[in-house]
Each structure stands twice: as C-alpha cells, then as structure tokens.
C-alpha cells in the first residue's frame, strides 16, 4: 500500500479513536487554567488557543482562566517597581495594582482573545473583576506580626452570569485572574489557580484542567519518568503528608480537591510546554499528565 495512503488511514484511525470522548463530552463544560512559563512561548500559546478552538468547534464548552505572573513582573520592572513576594504572594501596592490590572485585563487577555478569534473561535474577554469576588489577605510574619502585602486577596465568591450567557451562545469566555473586593469594589490580585478552582466550584465542569510548566504530579520532581498518572483525593493528600508533593504544588492540590468536593468530576495537571497537550489528555485513554478523581478505582 502506498505510504501516503497508509498515513491517511492512520490519521483517520486517530479521529475514529476519539469518537467515545466526543460522544461523552459534547455540550459539556471544561474549565482550563493555564500559566507559568508555558505562556512565555508565543508558539505554544497559539497552538493551545487553536486546540481550544477545536474543542469549541466540536461542541465542547471551554472556559479559560489565564495567569500572567512573568508579564506582571516585567511590566513592574519597566515602571521601576521591584517584584517582592511574601509567603509566595506578590506584594501589590496601590501603584502596582494598576499595573497588574492593565497587564492582565488590558494586555494579556485581549491578546489571547485575538489569537482565539484568529483561529475562527468565538472568544470573549472578561475581566476577572466582573466574575470574582474577593477579600483581602492579611499575612503575618514568623512572630505573628501583621505584614502589609497590599491589594492581594482570596476569591470568596463568583458571579457567573456573564460566563453562562456566553456559553449559551457557544462563545468561549477568557477570564483574567483579578477580583473585586467585597464592600470596596477595589481590584485585588488573586492566585489564578485558586481563582480557577473557585470558578469550577460554581460551574461544576466535567474537567478542571491546569496547564503549567510541569508534567503533573511526580514521585521525584526532577524525574519525569516518575509521573503519577492517576490518584484519588485521599491518595493526593497522602502525597502531601509524605512530602512527595511540596512547594507550589500543595495549594494546587488542595484547590483541586476543593473543586472535586464541590462536584467537579476530574481535575487534571498537564505540561503546557508540549504541543497538543490538552488534546492528548482529553482524547487518549492514558492521557499525558496526572488526573485526580473522587472515587476509588
């Protein structure tokens, strides 16, 4: 058989292999959060936007929450402001919050929307301040003394009307990670992972997918071959207790479990540095990253 025909048959087989997933997930909501160094490579971002457009065309309902930490640090440096962190939280002065808001909702978000539309998608940008309700975080040092970290908050609620309206029109919402402070209505800088989990608790998507710059949960963080493909909520907590999961992955895991407890079916952690990582996770039996599930296998 001609080699070209063979390749075409193989491509057709891949499409047919996706049939069970297309049948299972059509008209279902997927909440996709991406950030980290994966956002620094424009080629990867464009490929990801194209893949999400494909999901939209196939009848899925994607919702995107994006990050932008490195772009914020760059914008602050250009403005002569030093990036400082306390307990992993970016210190955000009143002067800095305007830069954060301008970078996230005024630069990154419209750029992603334009990429999405360039591939034929029907995306709409929504500032996080129209979705997330926040309260200010009050940090303390080791002696218990208060530390002022500025305009930084936790998400305590979500206003989902704009998102549900967009989904009803088969338009993909693309949301920036900012919250409006309860009472004052001032913008607050919030963790994008935790914001995505809070939104997932309200929307209850079939999947909450975190796309970052790590392959997933690994027994040895320096060895990708130790990737753990699937864990339950209890097993994930055990990985934190025994030290397998540490650092920045801990709040991600806790937020994932909160989402599962609220009704999300599965949470996935995948590597955004790999082309088509999202499609491989959704449309193949074994996936490419780590999934956290509610039920025992």
From Swiss-Prot:
GO cellular component terms listed in the entry, alphabetical order: cytoplasm
| Biological process, per Gene Ontology | arginine biosynthetic process via ornithine; L-arginine biosynthetic process
Binding residues annotated for substrate, in chain numbering: 68-69, 90, 189
Which reaction(s) are listed as its catalytic activity? N-acetyl-L-glutamate + ATP = N-acetyl-L-glutamyl 5-phosphate + ADP
Q: Where does the protein end up?
A: Cytoplasm
Q: What is its EC number?
A: 2.7.2.8
Q: Which Gene3D superfamilies match?
A: Acetylglutamate kinase-like (3.40.1160.10)
Q: Which family does it belong to?
A: Belongs to the acetylglutamate kinase family. ArgB subfamily.
Describe the function of this protein.
Catalyzes the ATP-dependent phosphorylation of N-acetyl-L-glutamate.
Q: What is this protein's record name?
A: Acetylglutamate kinase
> Upper lineage ranks?
Bacteria, Pseudomonadati, Verrucomicrobiota, Verrucomicrobiia, Verrucomicrobiales
